[in-house]
Amino acid sequence: MKTVLILLSILGMACALSMKNLNRRAKLEDSEENGVFKYRPQYYVYKHGYFYPALKRFAVQSSSDSSEENGNGDSSEEEEEEEETSNEEGNNGGNEDSDENEDEESEAENTTLSTTTLGYGEITPGTGDIGLAAIWLPRKAGATGKKATKEDESDEEEEEEEEEENEAEVDDNEQGINGTSSNSTEVDNGHGSSGGDNGEEDGEEESVTEANTEGITVAGETTTSPNGGFKPTTPHQEVYGTTPPPFGKITTPGEYEQTGTNEYDNGYEIYESENGDPRGDNYRAYEDEYSYYKGRGYDSYDGQDYYSHQ
């Protein structure tokens, strides 16, 4: 019992001291001096819980939890999944369906991805205003390999057909130039083409070429001249706007435009009137002296010899 009483007394004293210290701190913190010079902010749990909630509550700072912001993203993902499933179904279908789809896709790619560069503001003929329709999803390696092999085979077949058509056109042109084909002569004769027939054909070709050359010379009326086949030509008067003078005639100054013909006009720009102040110095202040000494010699002054009467 004694030990229990001793422990209780010790606990009471400790609690009393702690309460005194708390009361003193409360009184000191309420004073103006401690509020200014000894500010001790008290941290409480409810402040953190109230002023700093989880970021999900703020719509601005949310990254991927709000359904409003990611509505477009979810729809785009669904569209991509639908496209992938449709493509897989098309690939798993029959060979005819796959070939038709590949042809349509190749045509669409050719229309959407045009190689020509257009000017500013122009719209490509394939894309237009279709948004993201020109973007294609990547296919599997096996499908691309099959597609490449089929395209190579189709290209080779097209090249062979073009070569055959070109050869047929060349044969037709040769037959048209020669007039009559060798096959027709063989059928008519029954025993092959003879030398006389060939000679007649050669003669006809020569006559045709001679007639062509004669027609060209008559229509062209070519004439020879000592200057290597070229004639000296004079340009039309309308080209230069002026008539050239005849050969051997010398032009007079009156035929050209003359400036500064006026008494006071020295070719400067004139303001307000014909005899206005021009730009620059024309020595108008010395006009009287110049006119007075104009007809006199350098050695005379007032009609007398300057050096003899000195």
Curated annotation (Swiss-Prot):
Keyword Secreted recorded: yes
Carbohydrate-modified residues: N110, N178, N183
Record has Glycoprotein as a keyword: yes
Pfam families recorded: BSP_II (PF05432)
Signal peptide range: 1-16
Location in or out of the cell: Secreted
S-S bridge residues: none
Domain of life, source organism: Eukaryota
Entry's free-text remark on domains: The Arg-Gly-Asp (RGD) sequence serves as an integrin-binding motif and is required for integrin-mediated cell attachment.
Known role: Binds tightly to hydroxyapatite. Appears to form an integral part of the mineralized matrix. Probably important to cell-matrix interaction. Promotes adhesion and migration of various cells via the alpha-V/beta-3 integrin receptor (ITGAV:ITGB3).
Protein name: Integrin-binding sialoprotein
Gene, per the UniProt record: IBSP
